[in-house]
């Protein structure tokens, strides 16, 4: 096993809990690590990529920077039209770069999900919406952390899909995916995912938003907001926080299944299921429907292989 994947298993196994070895072994085989990389992308009138920038490039492993460059050059979008005419268009970009073990001697990294939203990440904050053209939080109460999961040092991320009506209330909410940073058998993992998902949905139902009153979205009857909720545990008596990797650092976890949501299915199929590409920056994320990727997400940079080595620090 490579040093990189060995480190992932150590990170997920401590503090240790006792589970049936067969179930844990199955979970180990599905372990992956990823990091979220944000930036901006510009698309030519013909749909090719004009250029891009990455936030805090100096914090990213060189292998990740190179992979993204090779991947994006092969992308092709549906031309973005303004008043019926294709034009150069910019969007906020968020990419999920995933590292997986191929065999005992090789690891591979690839871009596995992407999200494109407002032109800049700050466009959904109240201060940037003085003209009330954006959706913004009025109330976002955090969820309650299930006590038994805290005691078992279970951390993870829940990816929610939230439908907001014209009154700024949550009309529908569903869990799209739950990734866990603990090893256990399948039954236990399912239970933990269910508990974190229920806690997240319960909190989301109490949220309130200010809805767009001006601009292109003012006439919409509802908005779909993608929200990641991170659950992390601080180890008593230490500064260690389980489940809070920094920007440019690898986040090890057992990925959960992507749930197909009936009222969201059209968007999920069109975007190849990009739930885990949503950044948790405290602002409502609304995908920009104008940016439709026509080529495979991995482009020409998919699956870069690293023989017996770590694909980069972080």
Predicted region positions:
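N-terminal signal peptide c-region/cleavage motif recognized by signal peptidases
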Residues: 13-15
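Charge-biased low-complexity segments
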Residues: 19-314
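Bacterial N-terminal signal peptides that target proteins for export
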Residues: 1-8
């Amino acid at each position: 096993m490579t040093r990189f994947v060995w480190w992932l298993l150590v990170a997920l196994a401590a503090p240790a809990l006792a589970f049936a070895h067969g179930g844990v072994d199955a979970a180990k085989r599905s372990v992956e690590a990823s990091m979220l990389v944000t930036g901006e992308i510009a698309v030519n009138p013909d749909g090719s990529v004009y250029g891009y920038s990455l936030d805090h490039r100096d914090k990213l492993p060189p292998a990740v920077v190179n992979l993204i460059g090779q991947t994006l050059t092969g992308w092709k979008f549906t031309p973005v039209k303004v008043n019926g005419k294709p034009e150069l268009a910019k969007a906020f970009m968020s990419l999920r770069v995933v590292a997986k073990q191929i065999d005992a001697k090789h690891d591979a990294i690839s871009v596995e999900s992407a999200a494109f939203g407002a032109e800049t990440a700050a466009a959904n904050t109240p201060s940037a919406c003085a003209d009330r053209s954006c959706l913004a939080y009025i109330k976002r109460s955090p969820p309650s952390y299930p006590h038994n999961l805290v005691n078992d040092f279970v951390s993870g991320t829940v990816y929610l899909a939230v439908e907001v009506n014209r009154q700024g209330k949550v009309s529908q909410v569903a869990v799209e995916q739950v990734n866990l940073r603990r090893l256990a058998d399948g039954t236990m993992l399912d239970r933990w995912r269910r508990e974190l998902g229920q806690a997240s949905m319960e909190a989301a139902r109490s949220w309130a938003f200010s809805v767009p009153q001006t601009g292109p979205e003012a006439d919409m009857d509802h908005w779909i907001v993608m929200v990641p909720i991170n659950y992390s545990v601080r180890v008593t008596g230490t500064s260690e926080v389980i489940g809070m990797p920094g920007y440019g650092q690898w986040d090890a976890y057992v990925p959960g299944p992507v749930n197909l949501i009936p009222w969201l299915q059209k968007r999920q199929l069109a975007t190849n299921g990009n739930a885990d590409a949503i950044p948790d920056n405290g602002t409502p994320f609304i995908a920009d429907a104008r940016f439709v990727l026509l080529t495979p997400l991995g482009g020409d940079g998919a699956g870069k292989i690293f023989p017996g080595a770590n694909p980069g620090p972080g």
